[in-house]
Each structure stands twice: as structure tokens, then as C-alpha cells.
Amino acid sequence: MLTKKEQRLRRSRQTRIRIANQGVARLSVNRTNLHIYASVISGDGTKVLASASTAEVEVRNEIGGSGKGGNVAAAQAIGKRIAEKAKAAGVEKVAFDRAGFAYHGRVKALADAAREAGLQF
């Protein structure tokens, strides 16, 4: 029987295969208990076009100091920031890769904030 983490990794592999076949840039999200990370990766998967995380100093100052990167408000800030960086890199449309995480809580907050900031997926 697969563990919960192995099941999540299997789901993420399948998603990445489907996205790679589309050939569109992907917005990849990873979360830990303390931080949330987002990156926009090129359609062929060779280059990171934009990235943002709560581990960045500017973001930590914006969200209110250290140790506050694992909440919904921080995820919203990262969603807005990744959308701005992606648009600056010339990317308007992406495929959302939630890496097997449930579309709920911090992952959903990041996605909604990125959509509101103008990223299409």
C-alpha cells in the first residue's frame, strides 16, 4: 500500500506528464509547513521563468516577519507576486500544477490570487 506522500507524488507525476503534452508554461506550487513556493516553468520544462516564495526577504517583510509563511495570507501574497513576475517575463497563460496537493486552503488561495492578478489558467 502506498503512503500518503507516495500517492501525492504519483498524482503529481501524472499531472506533469499531461501538462508537458500541452506544451504550455506551468505554474508549479509546493508547500511545506513553514513556507509556500511557486514557480513558472517553460513549456518544455527546461527553464524557470519566474519564481516566488515566502522564504524571500521582501515577501517576509511584506507579510509580517519571520515564521508567518505557512498561512493563507502569505499564499495570497505569493500568488499575486508570481503573477506579476510571470507577466513581466511575458507569460500570460499557464497550466496549474498543484503537485498532488488538494485544491484547498493555501494552494487555492495562491491560485485565486494569481488569477486576480491577471494570470490565466
Curated annotation (Swiss-Prot):
Biological process (GO) annotations?
A: translation
Give this protein's Gene Ontology molecular function annotations: 5S rRNA binding; structural constituent of ribosome
GO annotation, cellular component aspect: cytosolic large ribosomal subunit
Q: Does the keyword Cytoplasm apply?
A: no
| Matching InterPro entries | Ribosomal_uL18_bac-type, Ribosomal_uL18_bac/euk
User: Which UniProt key words apply to this protein?
Assistant: Ribonucleoprotein, Ribosomal protein, RNA-binding, rRNA-binding
| Pfam families, sorted | Ribosomal_L18p
Report what the protein is called. Answer: Large ribosomal subunit protein uL18
Supply the source organism's classification. Bacteria, Pseudomonadati, Pseudomonadota, Betaproteobacteria, Burkholderiales
Q: What gene is this protein translated from?
A: rplR
